């Protein structure tokens, strides 16, 4: 399941583009239940890094834990495990949100006149361009009208791909 490119993309978003998160997930898959300390040693990662990744995965409901108190030290020990049964739902929800965001972006692109700075390549809406006197806020260069037809086509293509994936992929049935 972790080899699916859509799942990988969603996991990267969840993990903040930290590729070590995949290693943590693989360790959880291989070892079933494991402590953060064991993951840290196995992957040669700082314990703090492993914990941050586990918390991100926990917030996304992709891992779960048990907490046990050591009676001698009064410290808590956490045993983590992957909960991949929730992964398709998490991915589907994120894809549906992405679809909503893309449709909103498409609406803006189709209904707004844009300008850009040829030097900085910053893009401005018509209202922003007026506010700046048709000058770039970064380099003071003269703004030119921006043809966003390619942007619109790209967004429409992304929407089509996501809609098809949601409709056809058995993972999301």
Swiss-Prot record:
Location of the HTH TFE/IIEalpha-type domain: 3-88
Cross-referenced SMART domains: TFIIE
Gene Ontology molecular functions: DNA binding
InterPro entries: TF_E_archaea (IPR016481), TFE (IPR039997), TFIIE/TFIIEa_HTH (IPR017919), TFIIE_asu (IPR002853), TFIIEa/SarR/Rpc3_HTH_dom (IPR024550), WH-like_DNA-bd_sf (IPR036388), WH_DNA-bd_sf (IPR036390)
Gene name linked to the record: tfe
Name of the protein in its database record: Transcription factor E
Quaternary assembly: Monomer. Interaction with RNA polymerase subunits RpoF and RpoE is necessary for Tfe stimulatory transcription activity. Able to interact with Tbp and RNA polymerase in the absence of DNA promoter. Interacts both with the preinitiation and elongation complexes.
Keywords on record: DNA-binding, Transcription, Transcription regulation
Gene Ontology biological process terms, A to Z: regulation of DNA-templated transcription; transcription initiation at RNA polymerase II promoter
Signal peptide positions (record): none
Task of the protein: Transcription factor that plays a role in the activation of archaeal genes transcribed by RNA polymerase. Facilitates transcription initiation by enhancing TATA-box recognition by TATA-box-binding protein (Tbp), and transcription factor B (Tfb) and RNA polymerase recruitment. Not absolutely required for transcription in vitro, but particularly important in cases where Tbp or Tfb function is not optimal. It dynamically alters the nucleic acid-binding properties of RNA polymerases by stabilizing the initiation complex and destabilizing elongation complexes.
Family: Belongs to the TFE family.
Domain notes: The winged helix domain is involved in binding to DNA in the preinitiation complex.
TM stretches of this protein: none
PANTHER family associated with the record: GENERAL TRANSCRIPTION FACTOR IIE SUBUNIT 1, TRANSCRIPTION INITIATION FACTOR IIE, ALPHA SUBUNIT
SUPFAM superfamilies for the chain: Winged helix' DNA-binding domain
